[in-house]
Curated annotation (Swiss-Prot):
NCBIfam families: rpmF_bact. GO terms for cellular component: large ribosomal subunit. Residues 1-35 are annotated as: Disordered. Keywords: Ribonucleoprotein, Ribosomal protein. It comes from Proteus mirabilis (strain HI4320). GO terms for biological process: translation. The keyword Ribosomal protein applies. This is Large ribosomal subunit protein bL32. Belongs to the bacterial ribosomal protein bL32 family. InterPro entries: Ribosomal_bL32, Ribosomal_bL32_bact, Ribosomal_zn-bd. It comes from the Bacteria.
Length: 56
C-alpha cells in the first residue's frame, strides 16, 4: 500500500483544489414571455429566442 513520504502543505492542497469551485448557472429572460430559462435552452412554455418552437 502506498504511503506518503512527507505531509502535503496547505499551499499544495489549495493549488490542487483551485479548479473545484462551482460556477453559477447562466440564466436568461425570454423576450416574448418574460420567463427565465437556461441559456441556449427552450423555456418551459415552448419559446426559444422569441419564437414558439414547441406546441403544448
Amino acid at each position: 500500500m502506498a504511503v506518503q513520504q512527507n505531509k502535503p502543505t496547505r499551499s499544495k492542497r489549495g493549488m490542487r483544489r483551485s479548479h473545484d469551485a462551482l460556477t453559477a448557472t447562466h440564466v436568461s429572460v425570454d423576450k416574448t414571455s418574460g420567463e427565465t430559462h437556461l441559456r441556449h435552452h427552450v423555456t418551459a412554455d415552448g419559446y426559444y429566442r422569441g419564437r414558439k418552437v414547441i406546441n403544448k
